[in-house]
Structures are given as structure tokens and as C-alpha cells.
């Protein structure tokens, strides 16, 4: 069995973020939305968000100070933050959207905090098995079902030390801050390798 990476660091293939942007309309539209990427790592997701030009502001944060890099856009910030710490969220500015690939073993702690501190919604890249009603998330998921799932087929590869694809199915889970009266929309993304311009 392969060992877990330190801090659960598995960079997100850029094409998965392009697929998210192609599949979901983020409001406010027309370059007005603000975004926080709170588990930024080396910027795999935030670099695509910035390149897309769809957002007015993309701020980044990470628990590892070594992964915090200078902001490149006027008005943007990059800071050190433990996304499992309620106090860190309380000190942070509020954003329209939180978009990230959280460390899987910390996701149950991060998701409620991110959801409570976004204005419009959040998009989280998670294993599809996150839907299972485990003790550490069952109640929260029952009260906050996702508005949309974008499931990737074939499975993407997150580890450079494995051949082919990974052994777990992943999906973008999208929540809207003010309820979801239409149920959960399910989209199978079978052409994700054709999205965007990044590898």
C-alpha cells in the first residue's frame, strides 16, 4: 500500500478545474465574484481560476507557510491559514465562493467552516465516497445536501508515483449557500481531458 503524502498533498490536475468552470456557472457573473482557495498548496487550482478570468479576485491560503506564495494580482492576497480552525475563518474576509481540494482526512472539519463563511457557495473536490453517511459528516450532509455533483470518468491521476489512474472516484461537490430546493444535480464528466488549456 502506498503511504499517504505529508499534509495529504495531492495536487489537482488542471483539467479538473477547467471542467468545473465549464460545467458550472459561478455567480455573481461577469467577473464580479471573489474566491478563496484555502488549501492552495502549490496553486494547482488557483492558477486555473486566475487564468480563466472569470473572477474579480482569487485569494489563496495554506496551512504550510512554505506553500504561501506572493499574490500576483492587484488587490489579491496570499496568507497562512489552518482551514480546520474556526478562528482562522473568523479572522478571514468573506468571499463569494470557496473552491478547493481539501485534505481528505480534514474535509469533515473544513467543509462546515467554509460553507458558513462563503456568501454564495463552495466547490470541493472530494472522493465520491464522501457521500457515505459516516459519523463525522452524516448530520451535516443531511442538512446540507450538495446542489451538484460533477463525477469524473475515467478517474483522474493525483499521484505521480502510480501508473494510469488512481483507485478512487472523485467529483466536484458544489453547494449553494442559501438552500437547494431542486435536489442534487448529477453530471458525469466523461470528456474532462478535453477541457481548458492546462495539463
Predicted region positions:
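Class I S-adenosyl-L-methionine-dependent methyltransferase catalytic core
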Residues: 1-199
Amino acid at each position: 500500500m502506498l503511504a499517504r503524502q505529508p499534509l495529504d498533498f495531492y495536487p489537482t490536475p488542471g483539467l479538473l478545474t477547467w471542467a468545473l468552470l465549464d460545467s458550472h456557472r459561478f455567480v455573481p457573473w461577469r467577473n464580479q465574484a471573489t474566491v478563496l482557495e484555502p488549501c492552495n498548496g502549490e496553486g494547482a487550482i488557483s492558477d486555473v481560476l486566475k487564468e480563466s478570468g472569470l473572477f474579480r479576485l482569487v485569494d489563496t491560503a495554506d496551512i504550510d507557510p512554505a506553500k504561501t506564495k506572493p499574490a500576483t494580482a492587484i488587490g489579491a492576497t496570499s496568507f497562512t491559514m489552518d482551514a480546520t480552525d474556526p478562528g482562522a475563518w473568523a479572522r478571514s474576509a468573506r468571499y463569494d465562493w470557496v473552491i478547493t481540494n481539501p485534505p481528505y482526512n480534514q474535509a469533515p472539519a473544513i467543509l462546515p467552516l467554509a460553507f458558513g463563511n462563503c456568501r454564495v457557495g463552495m466547490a470541493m473536490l472530494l472522493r465520491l465516497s464522501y457521500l457515505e453517511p459516516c459519523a463525522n459528516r452524516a448530520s451535516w450532509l443531511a442538512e446540507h445536501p450538495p446542489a451538484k455533483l460533477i463525477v469524473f470518468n475515467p478517474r483522474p491521476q493525483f499521484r505521480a508515483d502510480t501508473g494510469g489512474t488512481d483507485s478512487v472516484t472523485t467529483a466536484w461537490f458544489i453547494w449553494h449557500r442559501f438552500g437547494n430546493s431542486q435536489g442534487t444535480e448529477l453530471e458525469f464528466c466523461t470528456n474532462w481531458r478535453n477541457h481548458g488549456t492546462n495539463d
